[in-house]
Amino acid sequence: MASPASIVKLPNRGMASDPEPAQVSYLPWLPYWAVMEADFLQVLRSWVYRSWVLVVALTAIGLFTYRWGLHHEAKIIQPASHVIIHLMRGMLVGSVALVGVIAAGAIAAERGSLADSILSRGISRHQYYLGKWHGRLLAIMLGHALLGAIAITGARFVLHEDVTVEGGAAAVAMSGAMLAVVVSLGVMMSALFARPLAAAAALWVLLYAAGVVFGALPHSVPTPEWVLQKLPYVLKGEFTREMLTQVAMYAGGACVASAVVGMFLFSRKDI
């Protein structure tokens, strides 16, 4: 048996060295983006969302067709701003119920698989909540902008033109701000309740209670009724930048406050 001293190591003839481990970059907001994208597409495919967009679009087309026939048969001049304000009132009142249902099912509808399938895969509760909130908010705002564009375009071409493009865009933005608050409150309720029906019921109770409180506030506060009263003038272009800023600040503050409360309670809730 050869001694250890007599063992000669042969030179390395072309043997490849061990490859260096690849640098893996971790994007901390990638789970949030995945949840937001999946939820956004899920809302677009839901029958409640499609029914909402279809019903409102058909209502607008039917109303414009009737008004157009009335104008050509009876020669009655109908300002577009009056027709649009009636349409937008109906859109907002009718949309609150369906939008509330869509928002209330953001988290409550996935309680059965929430802990095992989602929160155990490297995503925090805050990221999950933000992804759900922004996904629902983006889908609702997209649908509202589409319906608003249909209403403004139809009114300008079919009825007596007294609506400006800037006024129409501002009116859609102001009404969209109110829907954004409803969506934010709905997602907050969805994080607190285990069932979508309970979350939707709690949301409607909260909205009715808020309506009572809004009635006692000063007229300078941009409540939903205040916004609806200003819309006819906004459609004609009679608005100021301060008015839009005021609505955006109040609506944005309500959205952020509801999101903070929802994330705080959701992070401490046993699921």
Residue ranges and their predicted role:
Residues 118-125:
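Short helix-to-coil transition segments within interhelical loops
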Residues 31-34, 218-237:
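Short hydrophobic, aromatic-rich alpha-helical segments embedded in or entering the lipid bilayer
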Residues 2-54:
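Aromatic- and glycine-rich beta-strand/loop motifs that create alpha-glucan
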Residues 23, 49, 56-106, 129-203, ...:
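Secretory targeting signals
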Residues 126-130, 266:
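Alpha-helix N-cap/helix-start motif at helix boundaries, enriched for small hydrophobics
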Residues 42, 109, 121, 152-156, ...:
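Transmembrane helix-loop junction
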